[in-house]
Amino acid sequence: MAAAPAVCASQGSPPGAPSAPAAAPAPAAGLGRCRMALLLAVALDVAGMAALLTGVFAQLQVRGRDFGDLLIYSGALLVFLSLLGWILWYTGNIEISRQELERDYGLRPSALARLARKLSRRWSAPAAAGQRPAPGSRRARRAARAPPPPAAGSRRVRLQLATLEAGPGAAGAGSE
């Protein structure tokens, strides 16, 4: 028995990825492509209805306190939360052709897209020490101003400069 994927699998490849020429999308099975979302929705519905009906029809009292209301409210909450699973399952099974997707949501240059791309590149830039920053970037300018790191095996010498005051009788300390 094969395990179902944890997330809904898309049928197309990402926009920048090369597509396989002979790979046709797999037809959706009877339950659709997002089986985990369907399983979540059904499980929450069953648990919610069981709690709700138990709270309505069972006389649950512990030490004189009635717990029917707690089960009714928690069951209603679980049934409401199952809507998220149903929405995920439904939206994961919507099929849109690549042509329709590009026609409706084609890449339009916008300031927001440029800003998102710039932030994404900056945040995902490799932080490894061996890789150099792009020339002209803020990181490259900062690296140019910073002193180079000390070489392996070198000693660090601290030099402190102080002002010297000439006392009476010192060379060059006469009045002119």
Curated annotation (Swiss-Prot):
GO CC terms, sorted: membrane
Source organism (scientific name): Homo sapiens (Human)
Annotated protein name in UniProt: Transmembrane protein 238
Region ranges (Disordered): 1-22, 124-157
InterPro entries tied to this protein: TMEM238 (IPR029365)
Topology Cytoplasmic: residue spans: 1-36, 91-176
Main location: membrane
UniProt keyword list: Membrane, Phosphoprotein, Transmembrane, Transmembrane helix
Domain of life: Eukaryota
Residue spans of biased composition, Low complexity class: 9-22, 124-137
Chain positions found as Phosphoserine: 175
Compartment(s) where it occurs, according to its Swiss-Prot or TrEMBL record: Membrane
Membrane topology according to the record: Multi-pass membrane protein
The keyword Lipoprotein is annotated on this UniProt entry: no
Side of membrane Extracellular, spans: 58-69
Residue ranges crossing the lipid bilayer per the database entry: 37-57, 70-90
